[in-house]
């Protein structure tokens, strides 16, 4: 006896069977404390704003924003969820997050909406509908008009009263214009890589479609609650799009790293131990290129506050050297400069003491991402590296994501993972070259390093890109990525976007000095300048904030060779105003160079000041004390204890005099002046310091801490 089953019934049976397998393979997660806190904030906000409320989750990449949102939906009996995104490649990760909550949600995509027999209104089980905004806008275009299919798709969504609409990667769309044009650019198939450069720009800046208030007027979707997800919603925050504090939950990279530091599990990986620490290295390109070579891609700053402009588009400018127009072959116009840059990252003898791609360091950077300004530059660099002796002989696989086989979105991610899997089987290193593809919202756990060689100034895109490498990578219970690395070749850009990120992700309304301490501890920034590496410390970062309107002064101070000193020394001196004053006086500060000025200065205090007697006595005591100390050179070498001795000696002498306590400052000034006067009369301090520097250069090299100390003394003398 034969039993006939209709195709529709069979399809439903297979769908139910697949769903049962899905439920069996679930691995339920317990929300971390910050995720649970976010759920509570969401509950409070939407209880106070039950209709058409809107909320922003300003949480770092890898926070688990969608899992947190699913946890909130499960707890509050939210059954009809629509997720809209500009990054179709995140589909799998959003679907996978449903595996980690107890409630069973169906997951529908655009493929389901295309089925003629699919009716979302008749779905009784809780569900999540995932759509890219490109699809909602309509990617099948005829002269810019929506097709009947597009209208039908949108009409299906308009029939539903959604409990919750979610905008994923919302930074893409915060109040941007010309979106429709950009969407059409992205969806248009282009075979010519030179024309594709414009498409990449459109894809990177593709910004959602509208302001939140325009949702109903544009799509006429009905919803009770709306949540925007982003790790970098800086434009929205600057524009006060979410004006109430109750509308925003913030969790930053610094919050995560502080939790990791407090966890302190020496023998096992804790909840936060899996998240890599990020280190940023800024390479000073002027160290490896001649002045003539720099003119090609570096424009000197003009005016008081102007910085040099670095153009990576000019550095990586290309030309087509193929005689066949149908088969273009690209190479760099300034190929010798590009080769010089690549060689400097491989061989210490070619410019930089830190060489991330050298054989001894490559294990830290086994799978790297390299960001370039144009698609044609990607083709030119891929060709160059494949014929480079180092990459040819050391088992490197060069992956050019601008090749047509990668496509866009989900297809590109699948193709990339295929290449990475092949490389891992043969233990090869990989270098993935791209302009913007797969730099937003996606997860590639193998990437541990990013080289930033692109003209990009926005903090949103910059941090979205570099946080691709901060994805945890655990294999066989072993943490394969404890630290991840960012290599930037534009110091000014790096400091500016880092400053912006720090401001926009802090929860304390006051941008305090302690925040700079967090930046220094959890996101260290190093300047690589020839054979020296200098770590920025909190004081330098504060100086950057101070010099934000006068960056020329800051960049000169940071890059000055004389500023390469021990961090503890800089912090100690920088935090003590009296120490700075004493230091300047001991080193014959220019204020005291002219004997005439010195006499005038002394006369002013001795004759016109109402406390001149205390000052005069201090001068005499200071001279006597300096004379007792003997060799001035020994005093300079022991200066770091000497300034404290000055303070103690002056205090002891003052207490023996018959002065009022309120005259202490005048006495101390006079004492310091007397010490300085004795040293100036006794010896040329500038000559001592110069000779000492020359001696260290000849005998002990430029890297000893003592040499750096003398360089710094000379810096202050000047």
Curated annotation (Swiss-Prot):
InterPro entries: Helicase/UvrB_N, P-loop_NTPase
Task performed by this protein: Corresponds to the C-terminus of a putative G subtype type II restriction/methylase subunit.
Organism: Mycoplasma pneumoniae (strain ATCC 29342 / M129 / Subtype 1) (Mycoplasmoides pneumoniae)
Pfam family, one: ResIII
Protein name: Putative type II restriction enzyme and methyltransferase RM.MpnORF110P C-terminus
GO molecular function terms noted in the UniProt entry: ATP binding; DNA binding; hydrolase activity
């Amino acid at each position: 006896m034969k039993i006939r089953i209709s195709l529709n019934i069979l399809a439903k049976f297979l769908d139910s069977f697949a769903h049962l397998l899905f439920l069996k393979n679930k691995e339920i997660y317990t929300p971390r404390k910050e995720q649970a806190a976010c759920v509570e904030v969401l509950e409070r906000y939407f209880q106070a704003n039950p209709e058409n409320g809107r909320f922003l989750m300003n949480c770092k990449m890898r926070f688990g924003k969608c899992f947190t949102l699913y946890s909130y939906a499960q707890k509050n009996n939210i059954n009809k969820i629509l997720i809209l995104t500009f990054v179709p490649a995140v589909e799998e990760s959003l679907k996978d997050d449903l595996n980690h909550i107890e409630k069973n949600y169906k997951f529908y995509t655009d493929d389901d909406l295309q089925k003629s027999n699919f009716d979302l209104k008749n779905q009784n089980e809780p569900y999540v509908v995932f759509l890219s905004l490109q699809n909602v806008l309509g990617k099948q275009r005829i002269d810019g008009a929506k097709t009947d299919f597009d209208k039908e798709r949108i009409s299906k969504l308009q029939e539903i009263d959604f409990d919750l609409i979610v905008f994923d990667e919302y930074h893409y769309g915060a109040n941007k214009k010309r979106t429709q044009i950009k969407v059409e650019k992205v969806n248009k198939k282009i075979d010519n890589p030179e024309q594709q450069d414009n498409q990449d720009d459109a894809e990177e800046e593709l910004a959602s479609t509208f302001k939140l208030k325009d949702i109903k007027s544009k799509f006429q979707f009905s919803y009770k609650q709306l949540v925007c997800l982003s790790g970098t919603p800086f434009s929205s925050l600057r524009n006060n799009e979410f004006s109430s504090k109750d509308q925003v939950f913030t969790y930053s990279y610094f919050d995560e790293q502080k939790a990791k530091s407090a966890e302190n599990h020496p023998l096992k990986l804790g909840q936060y131990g899996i998240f890599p620490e990020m280190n940023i290295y800024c390479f000073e390109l002027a160290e490896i290129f001649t002045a003539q070579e720099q003119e090609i891609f570096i424009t000197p700053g003009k005016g008081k506050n102007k910085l040099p402009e670095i153009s990576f588009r000019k550095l990586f400018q290309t030309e087509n050297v193929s005689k066949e127009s149908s088969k273009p072959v690209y190479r760099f116009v300034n190929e010798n400069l590009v080769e010089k840059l690549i060689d400097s990252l491989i061989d210490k003898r070619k410019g930089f003491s830190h060489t991330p791609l050298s054989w001894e360091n490559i294990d830290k950077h086994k799978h790297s991402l390299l960001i370039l300004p144009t698609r044609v530059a990607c083709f030119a660099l891929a060709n160059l590296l494949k014929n480079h002796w180092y990459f040819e002989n050391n088992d490197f696989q060069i992956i050019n994501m601008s090749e047509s086989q990668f496509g866009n979105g989900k297809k590109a991610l699948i193709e990339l993972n295929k290449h990475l899997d092949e490389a891992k089987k043969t233990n090869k290193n990989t270098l993935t070259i791209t302009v913007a593809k797969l730099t937003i919202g996606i997860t590639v756990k193998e990437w541990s390093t990013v080289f930033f060689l692109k003209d990009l100034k926005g903090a949103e895109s910059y941090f979205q890109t570099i946080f691709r490498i901060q994805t945890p990578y655990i294999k066989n219970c072993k943490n394969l990525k404890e630290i991840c690395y960012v290599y930037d070749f534009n110091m000014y850009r790096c400091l500016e976007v880092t400053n912006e990120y720090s401001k926009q992700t802090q929860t304390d309304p006051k941008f305090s000095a302690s925040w700079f301490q967090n930046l220094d501890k959890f996101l260290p920034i190093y300047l690589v300048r020839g054979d020296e590496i200098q770590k920025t410390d909190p004081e330098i970062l504060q100086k950057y904030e101070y010099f934000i309107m006068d960056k020329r002064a800051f960049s000169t101070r940071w890059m000055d060779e004389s500023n390469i000193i021990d961090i503890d020394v800089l912090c100690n001196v920088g935090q003590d105003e009296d120490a700075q004053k004493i230091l300047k006086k001991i080193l014959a500060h220019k204020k005291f160079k002219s004997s005439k000025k010195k006499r005038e200065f002394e006369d002013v205090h001795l004759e016109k000041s109402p406390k001149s007697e205390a000052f005069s006595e201090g001068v005499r005591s200071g001279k006597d004390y300096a004379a007792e100390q003997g060799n001035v050179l020994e005093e300079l070498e022991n200066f770091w204890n000497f300034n404290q001795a000055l303070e103690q000696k002056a205090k002891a002498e003052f207490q023996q005099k018959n002065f009022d306590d309120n005259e202490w400052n005048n006495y101390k000034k006079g004492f310091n002046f007397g010490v300085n006067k004795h040293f100036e009369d006794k010896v040329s301090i500038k000559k001592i310091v110069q000779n000492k520097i020359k001696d260290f250069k000849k005998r002990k090299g430029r890297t000893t801490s003592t040499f750096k100390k003398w360089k710094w003394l000379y810096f202050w003398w000047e």
